[in-house]
Amino acid sequence: MNRDTKNNYSVFDTHCDTLCCVRDDGKSLNENDCHVDLKRMSEYKSYTQVFACFIDPIYKTCGAERTMNLTDTFHTHTQNLPQNVKAVLSIEGGEGIYSLSALRNYHRLGVKIAALTWNYSNHIASGALESDENRGLTDFGKTVVAEMNKIGMLIDVSHLNR
């Protein structure tokens, strides 16, 4: 699609892992070979991108630190967005949500959406790739969902098993 054609379209993309690429590989959000960059996004009439703080299973034991690092990356790289570009912050994988106060603090830092798992079980819920179809939300997971509803954080169910 050429630039003139793109100027006619508005995009709302609900997921990308670009924050991990920027954080881990030292890439620039301005222009990169990751999922999206500001240069490509600014070619559209309007572009809203949801940036995921993806908590890979290798970070399971330090999920909160990883979530905070990616949140910091988001804020560092989205301070001066082009006028037609909007950025939304999400969490993909609830390993960093170790308490309701942590959840509320992520919300205060701008997290608007959270996926409770990423395919595998954690302390909040069972994941999409798990065979235990009867597990669903844990007791803590139920309190997390209730708190998310209370504070207005959207629940992404795409990687849950039930």
Name each region found by the language model:
Residues 1-133:
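N-terminal hydrophobic targeting/anchoring segments and the immediately downstream early-domain regions
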Residues 1, 100-108, 130-162:
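Histidine/acidic residue-rich metal-binding segments in metalloenzymes
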